[in-house]
Every structure is written in structure tokens, then in C-alpha cells.
Design a protein with these regions (language model features):
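Redox-cofactor binding/interface segments in oxidoreductases and associated redox assembly factors
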Residues: 44-46, 87
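Short acidic, glycine/proline-rich loop/turn micro-motifs
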Residues: 55-59, 255-256
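Conserved NAD(P)H cofactor-binding loop of Rossmann-fold oxidoreductase domains
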Residues: 48-50
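Rossmann-like NAD(P)(H) cofactor-binding subdomain of soluble oxidoreductases
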Residues: 58-123
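Conserved N-terminal Rossmann-fold NAD(P) cofactor-binding segment
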Residues: 3-41, 56, 274-279
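C-terminal substrate-binding/catalytic lobe of Rossmann-fold NAD(P)-dependent dehydrogenases
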Residues: 103-109, 118-280
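Short, well-ordered amphipathic alpha-helical segments that serve as non-catalytic structural scaffolds
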Residues: 13, 44, 69-72
């Protein structure tokens, strides 16, 4: 079911998607609905919001997108919805926290896409560099989905080989190159927006992956935006960290043994998000 403030657009999108059902390998009904139809939904994916402009920080979108969410959530909650929220609207960590606080839902049922896409971008770039299938590059992007995100390189591996060992065995590979990859990940969205005005496919695939983990009860480890309650020494904030995702939403948070500098970078990212939230 699709809901949009522009009902005609939602109807057109539903029609377009329905025309491809024959190629999907399954049966489904796609239609434009109303907020009252949310009552029996298992999952609501929130993507509404103003588009990010060229060189605009995700955090600059906050006040405008909060107003949009307040209106949407009022209607959704009136329907009696009691499933899982998946938030993709930027700035996603703060928007997810807004959904959590307005809805009153338990934190495991309110999830943000977090740094799932950033992690996929990182693994793609590492796969290219080392000529390895990205699915075998086990590295994460943590923190805010934005400028303060970081890679805990001490935890990065190819299969079970630490990335530092792999880099040492690769001619011409230096830690500085890894830092350049990290910066490339951080700037990726800005470059895409500059080229084509918005990001569509990567985040769409990230949302599909998280949804699959939920409906398939997969217990998959994904870097989603989750509510910290003492993990990593932080509390009361949503931020992108590795989590086990299953049918209940976030089954648990995975605490990685971060190094001293990595802990500080996570703390700084949390502090930045908290300060921004308090400015609302």
C-alpha cells in the first residue's frame, strides 16, 4: 500500500508497479491507500520529506521534515497501527528518534536505515580495491548517517583476515588509502545529488534489505539506526550501529570492541546528534 499527500501520484505509482507484478515471481496487490488502512500493517516505511538540495547537510532538513512527520504520525497512530516503523527520511537518526518519541513505541520497533547504505558503499569500494566480492568484506560505517560517520577500521575484515593484514599484503596499499575510501563514502550522497538531484536506488535497496530481514526473521546483522540504552556508554539517542534484525525489529545491538579513537568518534557523533536534537 502506498500513501502520499498527492493521492493521484500514489495511484500512478501503484499502477506502474502492478504492471510489473508478472515479472516478480510472486503474487501481490499494490494500491494507493489511506492512513486508516495502516491499522493491520506489519511494517510502515516512512520516506516522506523535502528533498536534500545540493551541498545541503542532512541536518539542515530537520525542522522542515519534523513538521511533515508530526502530521503523518498523528494519522497513522489514529488508525491503531502497532507494527514496526522503518524510517528513511533524512536526517534519519534524528527523524527516527522523533518517530520513537511521538509514537511511544518500544525502541526495537522503531528503526532507521542508519548507515546501512554507507556500509554497502564502503564494502563496494573495498571489494573494488582488493578485487573481492563485496559480500565478503566485513566492514561497517557507524555513527550519524552524515558528516560525522566513521569506519572502525580495527573491526574491518575480509572473511576472517583483518583489513590491516590484507592491506599489508597488497602492493601499494597504505592506511591513508583506506582513509580516502572512508571519505569517498562520506561524500557519496553529495556527489550523487550534485549529478542527478537525489539518491534513489541505493537507499531503496537498503530499505528492501532491512524489510527482508524483518519479514524473513533473519537475525541478520545490519547497521541500522537504533536507540542506545547504555551500549557504547551512550544513552537516549538513535544512531547507526550494527544490530541483529529479525521479525521483532531490532533483536539486539552488537557492541564491537572499538579502539580508543573509534570510541571517541562515536561519542562525538552522538554528541553532535544530541546537540542538534536539542535545537528543535
Amino acid at each position: 500500500m502506498l500513501i502520499d499527500i498527492n493521492k493521484k501520484k500514489a495511484e500512478g505509482e501503484a499502477m506502474d508497479l502492478n504492471h510489473g507484478v508478472a515479472f516478480s515471481g510472486g503474487n501481490m496487490e499494490i494500491y494507493a491507500g489511506e492512513y486508516s488502512d495502516c491499522r493491520d500493517a506489519d511494517l510502515i516505511v516512512l520516506t516522506a520529506g523535502l528533498p536534500q538540495k545540493e551541498r545541503q547537510s542532512r541536518l539542515d532538513l530537520l525542522k522542515e521534515n519534523r513538521k511533515i512527520f508530526e502530521s503523518i504520525l498523528h494519522s497513522v497512530l489514529q488508525s491503531g497501527f502497532c507494527g514496526i516503523f522503518l524510517v528513511a527520511t533524512n536526517p534519519v537518526d534524528i527523524m527516527t528518534r522523533i518517530v520513537y518519541e511521538i509514537s511511544g513505541f518500544s525502541p526495537e520497533k522503531v528503526i532507521g536505515t542508519g548507515t546501512a547504505l554507507d556500509t554497502a558503499r564502503l564494502r563496494y569500494l573495498l571489494g573494488e580495491k582488493f578485487m573481492i566480492d563485496p559480500r565478503n568484506m566485513h566492514a561497517y560505517v557507524m555513527g550519524e548517517h552524515g558528516d560525522s560517520e566513521f569506519v572502525p577500521w580495527s573491526q574491518a575484515m575480509m572473511a576472517t583476515k583483518p583489513i590491516f593484514d590484507l592491506c599489508g599484503e597488497t602492493k601499494g596499499c597504505h592506511f591513508q588509502e583506506l582513509l580516502e575510501l572512508e571519505e569517498e563514502v562520506r561524500m557519496a550522497a553529495y556527489k550523487i545529488i550534485e549529478a542527478k538531484k537525489a539518491t534513489y536506488y541505493g537507499i531503496g535497496m537498503a530499505m528492501a534489505r532491512i524489510t527482508k530481514a524483518i519479514f524473513g526473521n533473519e537475525y541478520s546483522v545490519l547497521t541500522v539506526s537504533a536507540y542506545l540504552q547504555g551500549e557504547y556508554g551512550e544513552s537516549g539517542i538513535y544512531i547507526g550501529i550494527p544490530c541483529v534484525v529479525n521479525r521483532m525489529g531490532i533483536q539486539r545491538i552488537v557492541e564491537l570492541p572499538l579502539g580508543g579513537e573509534e570510541k571517541q568518534r562515536l561519542h562525538s557523533s552522538c554528541e553532535m546528534l544530541e546537540n542538534t536534537y536539542q535545537e528543535i
